[in-house]
UniProtKB/Swiss-Prot annotation:
The chain crosses the membrane at residues 233-255, 265-284. The lineage of its organism: Eukaryota, Metazoa, Ecdysozoa, Arthropoda, Hexapoda. Residues 357-366 have a biased composition (Basic and acidic residues). It comes from Drosophila melanogaster (Fruit fly). Residues 54-232, 285-366 are mitochondrial matrix. It holds the Pfam family MCU. GO terms for cellular component: mitochondrion; uniplex complex. It is found in: Mitochondrion inner membrane. This is Calcium uniporter protein, mitochondrial. The selectivity filter, in which calcium ions are arranged in single file, is composed of two acidic rings separated by one helical turn along the central axis of the channel pore. Inhibited by ruthenium red or its derivative Ru360. InterPro entries: MCU_C (IPR006769), MCU_fam (IPR039055). Residues 346-366 are annotated as: Disordered. The keyword Chaperone does not apply.
């Protein structure tokens, strides 16, 4: 009986010994759970690589911010709104981070940066998820919209970029409202001061132009008086010639000849006058109106005399046009009704300055 009891105790001890060993082994393996995961799920040639980059408690805190998407060989993260790509370079098997600009950088720039950092890269290409190569002109912004892969020499690295926030229509409306408020605040604080400063500036420019125009105005006044005298003389001379014609026709009709003879003569005289008026229209492209004829003669005489005394009419007209624009703008700024309106929305458009095209057209016909 005692022998049986001793045998049972020995068997029980032998039964407990491997269980105790297993317990100790399990406790030893629990000290490194990452290593346990590598032993059970990874092949032997990746064991050393995984042990080199096993995460610690501090790395866990960092991973909360970086959040790699496709493992440790390559991943994309956003730092201060800008994408940063971390890639393991093949030559020294080191991680290298590249800061990318979504709009100004493209795929060609990314590949050039990879080759510049590692001279051992012979072939590099970017492939989309359908296996089609992406052109070098594709922007980084478009590239990061979907998953892709980078082929470096004989390795293919898959990348799943994190989703980024895009601008929506509602956010644009909010930005527009903020801009309106800022514009109203700027107008309330600065428009009055700006208009006063602009008014003083226009007044100074107008004063300078008037000082420059003063001697030219005197010469132009002399030329205008001379042209007016010539035009007035031509007007009265035309009336005198018509009176002489009337007297000659009357003399020939009632004294020298009879009406039967002079009737066809007066007809041809009248028809000749009509032909002269039509010839005037063919030359000037304007109807023969007394006021237009007088103005045309005045302009011709003025330009002819200005050329004789070397008066620069083009420069004078340019100064007058600038002066008219300054006066118009100054009047518009000082008008309380039109103070905050642009030039094409003013309520009073009287006495607007002539444009350069209108001046050229008028000069062409005169």
């Amino acid at each position: 009986m005692s022998r049986n009891r001793a045998a049972m105790v020995s068997a029980f001890r032998l039964f407990l010994r491997p269980a105790t060993t297993t317990t100790h082994r399990s406790l030893a393996l629990r000290l490194a759970p990452g290593t346990t995961f590598a032993l059970h799920l990874r092949p032997c040639h990746e064991l050393q690589q995984h042990r080199s980059f096993a995460s610690t408690a501090e790395d866990g805190e960092t991973d909360k911010h970086k959040k790699p998407t496709t493992g440790e060989d390559i991943y994309v993260e956003y730092v201060n709104g800008m994408p940063h790509m971390t890639v393991r370079l093949p030559s020294r098997n080191e991680l290298c981070q590249f800061a990318l600009k979504p709009i100004s950088h493209n795929v060609g720039d990314l590949l050039a940066m990879l080759r510049a950092e590692d001279r051992g890269i012979d072939r590099a290409a970017v492939i989309n998820k359908h296996g089609v190569r992406i052109a070098s002109s594709c922007t980084i912004e478009s590239l990061l919209d979907d998953s892709f892969s980078i082929q470096i020499n004989n390795r293919t690295l898959d990348v799943n970029p994190p989703k980024r926030d895009k601008v929506t229509l509602e956010s644009m409306d909010k930005v527009g409202d903020v801009r309106k408020v800022i514009a109203q605040l700027y107008e309330a604080f600065n428009v009055g001061e700006y208009q006063l400063e602009k008014s003083n500036q226009l007044a100074k420019e107008l004063e300078t132009l008037r000082y420059e125009l003063e001697p030219l105005e005197e010469k132009k006044l002399e030329l205008s008086k001379k042209a007016a005298r010539r035009t007035n003389f031509m007007t009265w001379m035309g009336l005198g010639l018509m009176s002489v014609q009337f007297g000659i026709l009357a003399r020939l009709t009632w004294w020298e000849y009879s009406w039967d003879i002079m009737e066809p003569v007066t007809y041809f005289v009248t028809y000749g006058t009509t032909m002269a008026m039509y010839a005037y229209y063919c030359v000037t492209k304007r109807e023969y109106m007394m006021e237009d004829v007088k103005n045309r003669e005045f302009s011709l005489s003025l330009y002819r005399n200005a050329k004789k005394v070397q008066f620069d009419v083009e420069h004078y007209n340019e100064l007058k046009r600038k002066s008219a624009e300054l006066e118009y703008n100054l009047r518009r700024i000082n008008d309380p009704l039109n103070m905050q309106l642009p030039s094409h929305l003013v309520r009073t458009q009287e006495n607007t300055p002539p444009t350069l095209t209108e001046e050229k057209a008028e000069r062409k016909y005169t």
